């Protein structure tokens, strides 16, 4: 948590929103508020990686996927990566409870400066946004969706991945 304490004094939030960290992603990291949009969650997750706040990454992943994550590997990756910038390319409201955010993140890895571009899917469960992680084992198309709404995966979040 010392990274977060240090970040609270940052004038500009690492998510590049042009807001002070404490008024932007900091309030989410400290659980003083929850992101109201998928884009806010995307920005707060990026900032969590910048600050190596892996517990936040885990709790903002779809609840049914959280136990499938490997926090130690996420921490190792975060420790070996220097984040240089975030650009939100597009946000889409897919349904009332599902949104997509396309972004590009620039980072310095072991191989040099790289860009990661992705279209991420977010789901709103009980009035909170979560990231649907496509890198962990997903249900088959006929199994219940990871979001818990009771639809088959193929007719819910699976249709957007």
From Swiss-Prot:
It comes from the Bacteria. InterPro entries: NTF2-like_dom_sf (IPR032710), UPF0225 (IPR023006), YchJ-like_M (IPR048469). Belongs to the UPF0225 family. HAMAP family: UPF0225. This is UPF0225 protein NTHI0386. It comes from Haemophilus influenzae (strain 86-028NP).
